[in-house]
């Protein structure tokens, strides 16, 4: 299983114009070198950060986006 950091790096490669609303959560994900949904970034869990990223990433579209979003959803369930 990939870490949240690895996934965030791929998102940055695939999503050219990251939404300013999703960017803070993407930046936080890039600091979580774990695949544990309970891993912490400051006071927030990875699950919290990913959930907020997903809710703000509606502009991230296409086959890669669908695959990555599904991967993230499965990691926080």
Describe the predicted segments one by one.
Residues 16-23, 37-40, 61, 65:
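Residue-level signal for secondary-structure boundary elements
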Residues 7, 29-32, 57, 75:
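Low-complexity, intrinsically disordered/propeptide-like segments
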Residues 33-61:
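Acidic, low-complexity, intrinsically disordered interaction modules
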Residues 22-25, 50, 56, 68:
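Terminal low-complexity, poorly structured segments
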Residues 2-28:
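N-terminal acidic leader/helix
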Residues 56-77:
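Short, compact, well-ordered microdomains
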Residues 8, 26-29, 47, 65, ...:
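Generic L/I/V-rich hydrophobic alpha-helical segments across diverse proteins
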